[in-house]
C-alpha cells in the first residue's frame, strides 16, 4: 500500500470540529485509501494544538492506536540531519516537526505529503526535491 506523510495541520483539523479545514480533512481521509505516516514531533504538535480538550487529545491517540496512522522510526542518528535542515531553512523557518517529516521522506522514500502549510514547497530533501502536497486547500 502506498503511503504519504501527514503534517499536524490536517490532523488538528480532523479532530477540531471548529477548525476551518475540518470538513476538508474529513473528506480527504475518507477518500484517501493509502497509508499515513508521521513522526512523534508531529503527534506532539497536534496534541498540543488540541489541548483545549483532554478528551479530544485522547480520541486522537486512540485513533493512532487503532491504526489511523503509522509512526516513523527516527532516533538520535537523525539529529545531525534535523540540525542541518533547520539551519538550511532557518529563514522560513523550519520547526522540528517539519524537519522530522523531511527526514522521514528521505528515509522512507516518500514524495507526497498532506499539509495545510505551503512551506513544503520550499523545503527540499537530500535529493533537492520538494514534497508534493496532495491536501486540498
Residue ranges and their predicted role:
Residues 1-19:
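Metal-dependent nucleic-acid phosphoesterase active-site entry motif
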Residues 2-4, 23-93, 103, 107-111, ...:
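PIN-domain endoribonuclease scaffold, especially VapC-family toxins
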Residues 7-8, 39, 116:
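A secondary-structure boundary/capping signal
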Residues 8, 98-99:
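Conserved glycosyltransferase catalytic-site signature
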Residues 14-15, 114, 124:
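Activation segment
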Residues 117-121:
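Low-complexity, intrinsically disordered Gly/Pro/Thr-rich segments
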Amino acid at each position: 500500500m502506498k503511503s504519504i506523510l501527514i503534517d499536524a495541520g490536517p490532523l488538528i483539523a480532523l479532530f477540531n470540529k471548529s477548525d476551518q479545514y475540518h470538513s476538508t480533512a474529513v473528506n480527504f481521509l475518507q477518500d484517501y485509501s493509502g497509508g499515513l505516516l508521521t513522526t512523534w514531533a508531529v503527534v506532539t504538535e497536534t496534541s498540543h494544538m488540541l489541548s483545549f480538550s483532554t478528551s479530544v487529545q485522547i480520541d486522537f491517540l486512540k485513533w493512532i492506536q487503532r491504526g489511523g496512522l503509522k509512526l516513523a522510526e527516527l532516533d538520535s542518528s537523525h539529529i545531525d540531519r534535523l540540525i542541518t535542515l533547520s539551519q538550511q531553512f532557518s529563514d522560513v523557518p523550519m520547526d522540528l516537526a517539519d524537519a522530522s517529516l523531511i527526514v522521514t521522506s528521505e528515509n522512507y522514500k516518500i514524495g507526497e505529503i498532506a499539509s495545510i502549510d505551503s512551506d513544503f514547497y520550499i523545503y527540499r530533501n537530500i535529493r533537492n526535491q520538494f514534497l508534493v502536497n496532495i491536501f486540498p486547500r
